[in-house]
Amino acid sequence: MKYFEKRFLDVYRPLYIGVIFLGIILDLVTKFLVILYFEPHRYLEVLGSFFRMTLTFNTGFVFGAFQDNAIPSLIATGIAIVFLIGYRWKNYDLGNPWGWNLVMAGAFGNFLDKFFVKIPGTGFRFGFQPNVGEYIGVVDFLDFDWPDFLLFSRWPAFNVADSCVTIGLTILIFTMKLEEEK
């Protein structure tokens, strides 16, 4: 048991766990506020057309896999989280711990979001079967316009959890590359 306790504290220090929980809470609170105050597919221009807040629902997994299928998407996300925890446990000295923590926060934030039906103007309820006027899927709301050389005129909307994963992976890639060069 002592090995487990030491290993757990090496990998998941209290500060790191706090960062993970902070990321999850920030993600879920922002999603709740957007559900409460926005109508689906209506937008609020924050910085003109460059940055808008638009309530959308992503019913798939990575790159739209399992679109409109809540249970397979939930299972795939759960498997990804178990893989991340196991990989981090085995390779706890690989990469930057802050990068790992951000990836975990984002993965858990979107995973938890998949357990709820969204009711615009009201909030959430636990479940996977929406009634009329209700939605399933992960709440996305950060909507940016990028230069026209991209294949689409607007970048797909995303959320705080997606941002945590992207920033965390960027940190991990750079730190692992630096470790490799040493």
Swiss-Prot record:
Any stretches that span the bilayer, and where are they? 15-35, 44-64, 65-85, 97-117, 155-175
Question: What Gene Ontology terms for biological process does this UniProt record contain?
Answer: proteolysis
InterPro entries, sorted: Peptidase_A8
Biochemical pathway = Protein modification; lipoprotein biosynthesis (signal peptide cleavage)
Q: What terms describe the molecular function in GO for this protein?
A: aspartic-type endopeptidase activity
Q: Which residues does UniProt mark as catalytic?
A: 140, 162
Q: Which GO terms describe its cellular component?
A: plasma membrane
- Catalytic activity from the UniProt record: Release of signal peptides from bacterial membrane prolipoproteins. Hydrolyzes -Xaa-Yaa-Zaa-|-(S,diacylglyceryl)Cys-, in which Xaa is hydrophobic (preferably Leu), and Yaa (Ala or Ser) and Zaa (Gly or Ala) have small, neutral side chains
Q: List the disulfide bonds.
A: none
Keywords carried by this UniProt record:
Aspartyl protease, Cell inner membrane, Cell membrane, Hydrolase, Membrane, Protease, Transmembrane, Transmembrane helix
The membrane topology term of the UniProt record is: Multi-pass membrane protein
EC numbers:
3.4.23.36
Q: Which Pfam families match?
A: Peptidase_A8
Localization, UniProt = Cell inner membrane
Give the family this protein belongs to, as stated in its UniProt record.
Answer: Belongs to the peptidase A8 family.
State the protein's purpose: This protein specifically catalyzes the removal of signal peptides from prolipoproteins.
Name of the protein in question = Lipoprotein signal peptidase
Print the organism lineage: Bacteria, Pseudomonadati, Spirochaetota, Spirochaetia, Leptospirales
State the encoding gene: lspA
